């Protein structure tokens, strides 16, 4: 089992999760495949990806796969709840993107409207960044 140093901070009514930079997506993926009792061949075959690409992902030579492929991976792995968020967070960090689960959730137009109603655009446009300070 991969041990990941996670630190939670409670500030201004919200939890902030800090992920230890030493853990990589490729390490987590390898551990999750092992925990699911899948062989590498069975995993990449079921996923429909080529062997060289899979081993490039597993070695960390390439960035984690795109969001749709991440979701397909998780369907095969049947992960624990805490592994799901870590999986998406690590992939997003290495891809320099918003985590796939959050990006998919933001496809809900009603939720986007609610989020935008909560944004202080004056602060955002003035400072160039926005930190929710509730």
List where the protein language model places each region.
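DNA major-groove recognition helix of helix-turn-helix/homeodomain DNA-binding modules
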Residues: 67-85
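Short alpha-helical "recognition helix" segments of helix-turn-helix
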Residues: 40-45
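Residues within the alpha-helical elements of helix-turn-helix
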Residues: 35, 46, 76
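C-terminal regulatory/oligomerization modules of transcriptional regulators
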Residues: 112-134
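A short, Lys/Arg-rich alpha-helix, primarily the initiator
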Residues: 2-38, 125-130
């Amino acid at each position: 089992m991969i041990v990941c140093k996670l630190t939670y901070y409670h500030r201004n009514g919200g939890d902030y999760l800090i992920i230890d930079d030493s853990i990589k997506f490729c390490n987590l993926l390898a551990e999750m495949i092992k925990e699911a009792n899948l062989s590498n061949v069975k995993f990449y075959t079921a996923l429909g990806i080529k062997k060289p690409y899979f081993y490039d992902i597993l070695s960390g030579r390439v960035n984690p796969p795109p969001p749709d492929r991440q979701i397909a991976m998780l369907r095969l792995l049947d992960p624990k709840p805490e592994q799901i968020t870590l999986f998406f967070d690590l992939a997003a960090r290495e891809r320099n993107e918003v985590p796939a689960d959050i990006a998919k959730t933001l496809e809900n137009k009603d939720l986007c409207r609610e989020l935008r109603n909560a944004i202080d655009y004056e602060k955002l446009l003035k400072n160039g960044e926005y930190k929710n300070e509730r």
